[in-house]
């Protein structure tokens, strides 16, 4: 199986996990020494190993994503495959009754080693910090998507 097919399978399993919190389903996708790195939007962190990665992602989902009734993911560029790396741009639009839609823009990079994710990175567009602060002020909502 090629890495893009692996990643698409992982992404599908991630969406299932988003719904049911069964993180064991994702464990086979990650190397034991995998790293997840987040850059931008004041969320900068580096999580090492599947246990820490899943705990950090779950924290962010519980405190941010799952507070919205709607979450729509759109790939805006790529995926670009180069060797063992895959890169793509995306926008996730969040919605909840009584609030303006909140578009979160960024990029992801995944690197594979021996068929498993060795590195997963998310970085947010440079203007997202300003956009998020303005959205929060207009909607009287405090956003907390921290992973650590």
Identify what each model region corresponds to.
Residues 4, 24-86:
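A solvent-exposed, acidic/Ser-Thr-rich amphipathic alpha-helical stretch
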Residues 11-14, 18, 30, 57, ...:
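Hydrophobic alpha-helical core bundles mediating ligand binding, dimerization, or RNAP-core interactions
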Residues 4, 8, 12-14, 20, ...:
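Alpha-helical interaction segments
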